[in-house]
Structure formats: C-alpha cells, structure tokens
Amino acid sequence: MDYSTATTTAGNGYSSPRDSSFPSSFTKFNSALTAGLLNPMSPPPPPAMHDKTRSSPTLFEMMASEADTIGKVPVQIHNGVLPSPSSSSSSSSAAATAARTTNVNHLVISAQDKQALAMQRISDLLVIRSPGNQFNDPNSSDVKLTLSSKDGISITMCVHRQILVAHSRFFAMKLSDRWSKQQLPPSSSPYIVEISDCDDVEVYIETLMLMYCRDLRKKMMRHDVSRVLGILKVSAAIGFDAGVLSCLEYLEAAPWSEDEEYRIASLLSELHLENVGATEVLRRVSVEASNGNNGSNGGSNDEVLLNLLHIVLEGKDEKARRDMKTLVSKMLRENSSGNDLRKESLYLACDGCLHKLKRQFLQAAESDLENVDQIARQADNLHWILDILIDRQIAEDFIVMWASLSELSEVHSKVPVVHRFEISRVTARIFVGIGKGQILTPKEVRCLLLRNWLTPFYDDFGWMRRASKGLDRYLIEDGLSNTILTLPLAWQQEFFLAWFDRFLNSNEDCPNIQRGFEVWWRRAFWRRKEQSQEPARLRVTASATENS
C-alpha cells in the first residue's frame, strides 16, 4: 500500500500527514489504529531499520493493510462455491484477522469478519449433502434462487420448482403456472427467483433443505432451540406447514432455558399458530393454555398455592421445611400482582396454625407438656405467614387477632421459657412491621398489643436473643421504640416509664429502647416548657398592640 501522500483523520479528530518525515512503521501503525484494529493504549512499534530488509511483513503491517483491502461490496456465493482466491483474499484475510484480534488482542470481531465467517458456514452448508439429495444440484434443478440479506450477503443456489411448490404456499404462488408462462425461459435455462432482505440467509437455506428431507424430526434433532426458532419463523413466513409442525413438535419436547422460554412464548404469540399446535407448546408455561377456555382442567392458582402452604406447614422434616419456606416466600414475593393467592386463603391457613398453638399453649400452662414442641412449630409457622401478609400489605387483621389473645398472654409465665420464646418472635416481628410503617392499625389496636404482649416479650427477650440464630437485636429495639412512639404522648409515658424501671433491674435481658425514651422525653418536657411560655408571649404582644 502507498502511504506517501495520503492524509488520515484519526478517530480523535487529528489528522496525521504521511510524508517522509514520519517513519513508515509509525504511519502503518497509525493507519491500523484509525481502522480500529489496535488498542489505542498500546505503544507504537519501534522505528523500522531502513538498512535491513525483511522477508515477510510484520503483524502490524498486515493488520494495517487489511483495513484498505476489505471491500465494501456484497460477498456472493454461487452454487455453494466461494469466490476465487484472488477475489476472496479480503474475506479470508478478514477471517484470519478475526482469529488474531480475538486470540491476541481480545478485540471485538468486526462486521466484515463476521460476514466472512458466515459466508464460510453457508458455503459448507451448501456443499455438504447426503447421497441422493438433490438440493443445490445444478444438473437436475430448474430454478436459480438468490437470497440476499441486509448486511450484504448474497447466495445463489439451485433448487427444484416441483419441490418448492409442493411444500410452500409462498413458492406455489411465486412459481405458479401463470408466472411460469410469463417467464418463458428457453428449455435449457432455469427460472430466476430473487428474495431480498432476508433476516438470516443461513437459516433460510436450512429451511429450504428441510423440504428435501424425508425425516424432518431426525433432522431437527441436530439443532438447538435458538436455531429451531429461526427455522419456525421462516417456515411460517413461506407457508411451509410441515416445517412449522416439526418445529412445534421439537419445541414441545425439548428442554428450554428461561431466556429461551421467553423467546418461544414471544414468537408463538407473534406468529399466531394456535390452530397448528402452538397451544401444545404453550401449555408448558401458560395456565390458560393448559386449562383451555373453560378452565375446567386442574385447580386455580389459589388452590394450588394454598395446597403448597399446607404441605409446608405440616411437613415432617424441619430442614426441608425451612428450605421450602424460603423458596415459597421468594416465589410469592416475585409475583408483584398478588392475585395468585387470596387474602382469605392466607388467613384460613393462619387460623389453623393459631388454633393448634392455643390448644398446646393452654395445655402446657396446666403442666401438660405432651406435644409441647408444637408451640414452637406453630409459632414459627405464624411468623412465616406474617411475613407473607406483610409483603402483601394485608397484615392488619393479623395484628388485631394477635393483640386480642389475652388468654395466652395471661398464662404466658406458666409455660417454660424454652417452649414459649418462639411466640415472642412473632411479637417482635409485629413491632418491626409497625415501626417500619409496613403495618397500619388504629392506635387502640397498637395499645392493646403492647398491654397484652409487651411484658411477655420482656420476659423472653434474653432467652430469645441467645437462642435465635440471626436475630437482629437492634432492628427489634428500633421497631419497639417506634411502635411506642406512634401512640398518644400520655400512653407513651406509661410504656417508657415501665421500660425504664425494668431496664435498670435487668439490663442484658431487656431490650434497649433508650433512643425512643429520649424522643419521648423531648416531646414531653421541652414542649411543656414551650407551651408554658407561649401565653406570656401572647400577652406581651397584645399589650403592645393596645399601646400602639
């Protein structure tokens, strides 16, 4: 290449004259940098030794010259044969550059390199065919079909009018007798058909090859889901019904990834293939498709999820129960609509757990410790259901129900702490929910909750803190402080003074709500002082007005 007089404008906006004042290696490096083939942060190669001849060009020179040799014209394949080496040097060079830039410099493959690789795959696809297959056979074909894409790829292949017409409604119309008579080719000349703006020429060719295949199912098994989706789109576009059915049969039986699942549902919805088997495919991911229009098959989402809740609540293996609770909570949390599980169903499950808890707790209070482990189990179940209710913003009725359980709070001290402390974890979760504004209830309900359950909560706090793994003490203390601070000031005083006395006598076994106490103190005494001074200021203002 001649670098003697050209002026190149680099990507940064500066132009670099290429004259004799610059070493040839620098100008070639600058040309490669301008073409986007090198990392701009890489240092330039050292100046060339003019007195030393090289037998072969350097890597920098090859990459620099490549930018000018890659042509802009579309690459064409005729009958599965790539252009001659002299005319295809730029394409093969681009493929080599792709390998070098990917493996050596870790750069993104350019559009020209991708085109060259695609052309090579298409060439291999057209050349290789099973014995007896007449696809792309120039000796027996009567149609020259040219496919061209938007990115400049153009392929001409030899196909058979009889096969295309028999399998495709598009080609049946395109190659109809009326159209054939208008063409009137000589007996030795094939018909010429051109299809432009193909999305993917390679997929289009594979779809045409299926028309020549006797066992489409076996042929389809060689492809992955992504390629089958491409074939399905082309088959639907050209009216290749056998190809559409084969693709749908494959998709119905093959496993999908989550990304493929979205693409499949989107494409089937776009193509409207319900009458030819798409519904069978969608039944894997759509309840409506599985149930049909009448919805008679299978249960509703609410029934299924309620059944799952009961299975988890009554499971025998504790480790498996914990794992499944986490899983079910995650799935319910991901469904933001909340229409899958009715409020009544959740509270029905809650009532069942609460009934068992009350029965076992009252028995334990009378020194009947048979099945006493059910107290902790049912309290844990209620804690889990409460989390779900809070996530769905429907926990207000639970707070009313829990605050009214005076029959349990009154006998709380009669049950050994090792069996009862899980109940206080439910109370703690309520404090956190109210303190964060996740649960909004009337002040009378909040006050009743504290009157019935605050003392039992204090009694269990030390044991709960030591026995419960992962317990966030500071989160609970902050929630309790905020819960008390939501009450009228006179009620706040009652609860904070009771805490103050208890904290001084059992420091470690009592939650530290000093922050809330300080807020109440400022509210109570500072404002009283301000209010006592306010009438005097008003009187002074009034007298000053009269004197004026």
From Swiss-Prot:
Lineage: Eukaryota, Viridiplantae, Streptophyta, Embryophyta, Tracheophyta
Residue spans of biased composition, Polar residues class: 1-14
Coiled-coil stretches noted in the UniProt entry, renumbered to this chain: none
Pathway stated in the Swiss-Prot or TrEMBL entry: Protein modification; protein ubiquitination
Record region (Disordered): 1-25, 77-97
Function: May act as a substrate-specific adapter of an E3 ubiquitin-protein ligase complex (CUL3-RBX1-BTB) which mediates the ubiquitination and subsequent proteasomal degradation of target proteins.
Listed name of the protein: BTB/POZ domain-containing protein At1g63850
Superkingdom as given in the UniProt entry: Eukaryota
Disulphide-bridged cysteine pairs: none
Domain statement: The BTB/POZ domain mediates the interaction with some component of ubiquitin ligase complexes.
Cleavable signal peptide: none
